[in-house]
From Swiss-Prot:
Gene Ontology molecular function, alphabetical: ATP binding; ATP hydrolysis activity; RNA binding; RNA helicase activity
Swiss-Prot/TrEMBL GO biological process terms: mRNA processing; regulation of translation; RNA splicing
Annotated InterPro entries: DEAD/DEAH_box_helicase_dom, Helicase_ATP-bd, Helicase_C-like, P-loop_NTPase
Bias-annotated ranges (Basic and acidic residues): 619-640, 656-671, 679-697
Range of the transit peptide: 1-37
SMART domains in UniProt: DEXDc (SM00487), HELICc (SM00490)
Domain Helicase ATP-binding residue range list: 106-296
Designated name of the protein: ATP-dependent RNA helicase MSS116, mitochondrial
Biological source species: Meyerozyma guilliermondii (strain ATCC 6260 / CBS 566 / DSM 6381 / JCM 1539 / NBRC 10279 / NRRL Y-324)
PROSITE patterns assigned: HELICASE_ATP_BIND_1 (PS51192), HELICASE_CTER (PS51194)
Lineage: Eukaryota, Fungi, Dikarya, Ascomycota, Saccharomycotina
Positions contributing to ATP binding: A119, K120, T121, G122, T123, G124, K125, T126
Main location: mitochondrion
Keyword annotations of the record: ATP-binding, Helicase, Hydrolase, Mitochondrion, mRNA processing, mRNA splicing, Nucleotide-binding, RNA-binding, Transit peptide, Translation regulation
Record's comment describing the protein's domains: The Q motif is unique to and characteristic of the DEAD box family of RNA helicases and controls ATP binding and hydrolysis.
Length: 714
C-alpha cells in the first residue's frame, strides 16, 4: 500500500492514467479540485494502474502549496482541449502546471455557472483562465465569424491587460493561420486606438472597465457580447478597491441586455473571479455576478503568511518624513553597485515618482555611485513608470525593466498588482500604502517564482500606526527593524540634488499633501504633524526655513480641512487667510485631532464600506447621482473629490497626486491646471484618462490641479 501511495504523489501518476486510457479506451474525467481521476465503474482496474485517490486528496489538503508535478499533457485525457493548445504550450516550453492551474482549469471547463479562485499573484493564474477561453474560441468559429465574442477578460489596469494579452500569445504563437483566425484577440484600454467594431470578428476581448463600459453603451457593439462563453474578472479585489463597483454594475446590466441578440438564447456564459484576497466585498460581488451556487477554489495555504514567505521584510524607522527620503536615497546609493541589485521604489503620487526619478538621474550623472561600472558591467537602468506617461512610453519601460537584470524602477501603485518582473531583489516603499492589501501586493513584486527578495519600508515616527495596522490586521512579521541615524559628517546628497528640481518639488509637495489627507483618516495619523513634517522636507531641500507653498483656498479648507490660522504658517493663498475663521473650534478639531472621526477621513479608499470596498446590488444606480475617481464619468450634480462625493456642487476633475479631487467651474470661468495627454476613455466621460497640459485662469488668479489617480484604467 505504501508503494501505491508513493505512486500517487509522483509525476508517474499522469503517465499511468494516460496509459490506462489508451489501453481501455474509456473516458477519464480530470477533477482539478482534487487532482484525481474519476474512473467509470465498468473499467477493471489493474494493480499497475491503481491509484490511491485518498492519498492524493490528503496530500493536497495537508499542503496545497506543495503540489505534485502534473504536466499539461495530462489534460488530454479529458478530451476537452484542442491539440493546438498543447502544441502552443510545448512551443512555449511550458511543461508542468502550477497549483492554480491544476486546481482551476478543469473546474472552469466543467462548471455550469462559475468559479471563485483565490490565488496569489505570480502563481500562473492567467494561464489558468486563458486555456478555457482559448478552447471556447476554437470550438465556436462560426459564431466568431458572425461577429460574436467568445471570451471576455476584465482587468483593473491597462498594464495588466497587456500582460494578460502576452500570456494568451504564448499559447497562440507558432500556430496555424486557421487557429489564429479562430482566436483573434483584441485589447480595449485607454491610451490606445479602439480597433473593435461589429465586423472585427473578435474571439477574445481583454479590457479595462471604463473602456469596456463605453463599448457596451454603444448599441451597435452590444450584440457582439450576446454569445459569450466565459467572462473573467482578474484581480477582482483590486477592481473593487479602486472603486470600479458602479462600472462593473453597468457592465453586468449591459451583458444581460446583450442576451436578447444571442444566436443561441439558451446559452449562459460562465463567470470566473480570480483574486488574491476573498473578503466580504468579493463574496458579495460573486453572488451578484454568478449567484450563490459557485465553486470556491482556494490555492493559498491556510497556514501561509499573508505575504510571501521568501520575502525578508524590514522596517527602517526614521524621526521624520525628511529623514525617510534621505535614508531611502542613501540606501539605494549604497546598494546600487551590488551585482544583483534590481529594485522597485514605490511612491504614492505621480509627481513624487517624477521628482524622485529626476534626483536619481542626477546622482547617476554626477557619479555619486560607480555608474559607469553599473551600466557597462551590469546593464543598469534607472526607469520610471506612472499614469501620466503615454501608453507607448509605459510599454517601453515595462519591456526594458523586464530585460534588465540590474537597476531601479521608480513607480506609483500602477505596478503594484499584476505586472510581473523577473529577478527583483528589493522592493522599497517610501510611505504608508492606501490600504493594507496594497502593501501586500507591492512587496509581492519580489520573490517571484520561488526566488528570494527583500522588502524595506522607510517609515517616520508620525506614520508608525500604519505598521501597527499591518501587524494587527495581517500578522505581518518584520524580520529586521532598524533605526536610521544620520551621519552628520556625510554630505546630504538628496538635499543638494533635490534643490535643482524646485518646480518638480513644489508639484510633489502639493500632491503629497493630498495623499496625506487621504491616509491620515484611514490610519488616524495626526494630520497637523504630517503637514509639519512635509514642510520640513520642503524647506530643508530649498534651504529656506520659512518657505511657503502657493495653493488655492479650497485646497486648504476642503482637502486638508485646515483652519486659516494654522495654514498661514505654511501656505500662501490669493487674498490671504481670514483669521476669524480659526475661531471655529469644530473645524480646528477636525484638522488637529489625532485622526478624527470617520467623517474626517480626508479622501480615503473607504467608498463602499468599512473594508474600503463593497458591491451592493440594492444601492440605487443613477448616472447623475455618482461621482467617480479615474476612468469614470464625473458627476454634474455633486461636489466630487476623487473617490467621495460631498454636497450638491461639482468640482469635477481637480486632482492631487494619483487621486482625483475635482476640476472647479464657476459659470464661464474655470480654474485649474492639468498635465499629460488627455484621452477620453468613454464617449460620455468628461475627464477620465486625463492629461493634457493646460492652464486656466480664474479671475486674475491662476491655480493648479493635478493628474488623476494613477493605478487606474488609464
Amino acid at each position: 500500500m505504501s508503494w501505491v501511495r508513493s505512486v500517487a504523489i509522483r509525476t508517474a501518476l499522469c503517465r499511468q492514467v494516460r496509459s490506462r486510457y489508451q489501453s481501455y479506451g474509456s473516458t477519464r474525467l480530470f477533477s482539478s479540485s482534487l487532482r484525481s481521476w474519476e474512473e467509470p465503474e465498468v473499467v477493471t482496474k489493474t494493480p499497475k494502474a491503481d491509484i490511491d485517490h485518498e492519498a492524493v486528496k490528503a496530500h493536497q489538503e495537508s499542503s496545497p502549496l506543495k503540489s505534485i508535478e502534473v504536466p499539461f499533457t495530462s489534460l488530454e485525457a479529458s478530451r476537452k482541449f484542442d491539440k493546438s493548445i498543447f502544441r502552443g504550450l510545448y512551443n512555449s516550453k511550458m511543461k508542468n502546471m502550477t497549483v492554480v492551474q491544476q486546481r482551476a482549469i478543469m473546474p472552469m471547463m466543467d462548471t455550469k455557472t462559475g468559479v471563485v479562485v483565490r490565488a496569489k499573484t505570480g502563481t500562473g493564474k492567467t494561464l489558468a483562465f486563458a486555456l478555457p477561453c482559448i478552447q471556447a474560441a476554437l470550438e465556436n468559429p462560426q459564431q466568431t465569424q458572425k461577429g460574436r465574442i467568445q471570451a471576455l477578460v476584465v482587468a483593473p489596469t491597462r498594464d495588466l491587460a497587456l500582460q494578460i494579452e502576452a500570456e494568451f500569445k504564448k499559447v497562440l504563437q507558432h500556430q496555424t493561420r486557421n487557429v489564429h483566425r479562430k482566436t483573434d484577440t483584441f485589447v480595449l484600454i485607454g491610451g490606445r486606438k479602439n480597433d473593435l467594431h461589429p465586423k472585427a470578428k473578435a474571439a477574445i476581448v481583454i479590457a479595462t472597465p471604463g473602456r469596456l463600459e463605453a463599448i457596451l453603451r454603444d448599441p451597435r457593439m452590444l450584440p457582439m457580447f450576446s454569445d459569450l462563453k466565459y467572462r473573467v474578472y482578474d484581480e477582482a479585489d483590486r477592481l473593487l478597491d479602486q472603486g470600479f463597483a458602479p462600472t462593473l454594475e453597468v457592465i453586468e446590466e449591459r451583458l444581460r441586455d446583450a442576451k436578447a441578440e444571442a444566436l443561441e438564447p439558451d446559452n449562459h456564459f460562465k463567470t470566473a473571479l480570480f483574486s488574491a484576497t476573498v473578503d466580504d466585498a468579493v463574496t458579495n460581488f460573486a453572488h451578484e455576478t454568478i449567484g450563490k451556487e459557485y465553486e470556491y477554489i482556494n490555492c493559498v495555504d491556510k497556514d501561509a503568511e499573508e505575504s510571501h514567505e521568501n520575502i525578508h521584510q524590514g522596517i527602517v524607522r526614521t524621526q521624520s518624513i525628511k529623514d525617510s527620503f534621505e535614508a531611502s536615497f542613501s540606501y539605494i546609493l549604497n546598494h546600487i553597485n551590488d551585482k544583483y541589485f534590481k529594485a522597485i521604489v514605490f511612491l504614492p503620487t505621480i509627481t513624487g515618482t517624477e521628482y524622485y526619478y529626476r534626483v536619481l538621474q542626477r546622482a547617476k550623472r554626477e557619479e555619486l555611485y560607480d555608474s559607469e561600472t553599473a551600466t557597462k558591467k551590469y546593464g543598469s537602468r534607472i526607469l520610471r513608470l506612472h499614469g501620466k506617461m503615454s501608453q507607448s512610453a509605459r510599454d517601453r519601460t515595462v519591456k526594458e525593466f523586464r530585460r534588465t537584470s540590474h537597476g531601479v524602477l521608480v513607480c506609483t501603485d500602477v505596478a503594484a498588482r499584476g505586472l510581473d518582473f523577473n529577478d527583483v531583489s528589493h522592493v522599497i516603499q517610501m510611505c504608508p500604502s492606501s490600504s493594507v492589501a496594497d502593501y501586500i501586493h507591492k512587496i509581492g513584486r519580489t520573490a517571484r517564482a520561488g526566488a528570494r527578495g527583500k522588502a524595506r519600508i522607510f517609515i517616520s515616527e508620525p506614520e508608525m500606526k500604519f505598521i501597527e495596522t499591518l501587524q494587527r490586521e495581517r500578522g505581518i512579521v518584520f524580520k529586521e527593524d532598524t533605526e536610521y541615524v544620520k551621519d552628520e559628517t556625510s554630505p546630504d546628497h538628496f538635499q543638494r540634488l533635490g534643490s535643482y528640481e524646485q518646480d518638480a518639488l513644489e508639484e510633489f509637495l502639493r500632491t503629497f499633501l493630498g495623499f496625506a489627507a487621504s491616509v491620515s483618516g484611514v490610519y488616524r495619523f495626526n494630520k497637523q504633524r504630517i503637514v509639519e513634517e512635509s514642510f520640513a522636507l520642503y524647506r530643508h531641500i530649498l534651504n529656506d526655513p520659512s518657505a511657503k507653498l502657493s495653493v488655492g483656498r479650497r485646497f486648504v479648507s476642503e482637502v486638508l480641512r485646515m483652519p486659516g490660522r494654522d495654514a498661514a504658517e505654511f501656505f500662501d493663498v490669493p487674498g490671504g487667510f481670514d483669521m476669524r475663521s480659526s475661531n471655529d473650534r469644530k473645524s480646528k478639531r477636525t484638522f488637529m485631532g489625532d485622526g478624527g472621526s470617520r467623517s474626517d477621513r480626508g479622501f480615503s479608499n473607504d467608498r463602499y464600506g468599512n473594508s474600503g470596498r463593497s458591491y451592493n446590488k440594492s444601492r440605487s444606480f443613477d448616472r447623475n447621482d455618482r461621482s467617480y475617481g479615474n476612468d469614470r464619468s464625473y458627476s454634474n450634480d455633486r461636489k466630487s473629490y476623487g473617490n467621495k462625493s460631498y454636497g450638491d456642487k461639482s468640482y469635477g476633475n481637480k486632482a492631487y497626486g494619483d487621486k482625483s479631487y475635482g476640476d472647479k467651474s464657476y459659470g464661464d470661468k474655470s480654474y485649474g491646471k492639468s498635465y499629460g495627454n488627455r484621452s477620453n476613455d468613454r464617449s460620455f466621460s468628461r475627464g477620465n484618462d486625463r492629461g493634457g497640459y493646460e492652464k486656466r485662469n480664474y479671475g486674475s488668479q491662476s491655480r493648479n490641479t493635478y493628474g488623476r489617480r494613477d493605478d487606474s484604467d488609464e
